Amino acid sequence: SFPTRRSSDLSMTAYSKNTKIISMNGGFVSNAVCDTCTTVIPAEVGLKERLEAALAETKLQQYQVTEQNGQITIFAKGVPAHASTPQLGVNAAGVTFECLEKAGFDDDFVKFYNEHIGTSCDGAGVGLKFEDEYGALTLCNGIVKTEDGIISCTIDIRVPVTLKAADVRTMCEARLEDENGRIEIGEIGDPLFFPRESPLVNALYKAYVDVTGDTEHEPMVIGGGTYAKSLKNIIAFGPEKLGMNYHIHSADEFILVSEMEEAVLIYMEAIKNLLAI
């Protein structure tokens, strides 16, 4: 089916206070799972071997641990995924933090990250686990970087449309800081949402049904952001069929030619229907 878009966007940034990590850098964009991460830490006796053992039990595509000149370098390659579906990816930064703790690397920010962010995607660590009839809140760490000895983690959160900005702040305010780290909340963007019974959604859905003959599937509601938010009475409307992994925001992202051709027909009908409203 063609999705309609929902959710408001929330950005957070986690900062270290005290950490033994020399540097940690990974990810390229905030709206995708951090899929590569390189970390440098002080060497400790037996730590390299313990890290390798911990990393071997993960779902990383690739990892490498090297020790030289009193430092250990960890390279981790995960699986990219769109920030609205982070559970489909493997977060290289999150897995690295997790393995550092499992390997016995005692560090304040490692503890903070694992307690507040971790490798889960539901926001439970910051008190934001929530789900409504349109879907669950998602949390995605997209970028990790080190500047002037401080590690920062850029976090993308997609908030279900029924959860208000004031509620979000109330839910997480007690979980934003402790002696090991702090999290800053950015602005919460307005959601884009149209009820199923609205004339706009009905016009678009009718176009889809008339072209495909599919009456089984209702319009999809997803957590993706969209530039349609910049205009009034506009909704994002595009092809994404259930059961198909399009590798959105990942390597080898694609769409089938047959789906593009079908989409053209749907758009033609949609324009006719919209003109009739």
Predicted regions span which residues?
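Short amphipathic alpha-helices in soluble, non-transmembrane regions
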Residues: 47-60, 88-90, 101-102, 167-176
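Self-splicing inteins and homing endonuclease
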Residues: 67-79
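Conserved short beta-strand edge segments in small beta-sheet-based binding/regulatory domains
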Residues: 60-70, 106, 178-187
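An extended, acidic, His-containing surface patch that forms the Zn2+-binding/catalytic region
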Residues: 77-148, 158-163, 167, 182-277
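A short, glycine/Asx- and small/polar-enriched loop/turn
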Residues: 32-36, 68-70, 135, 148-151, ...
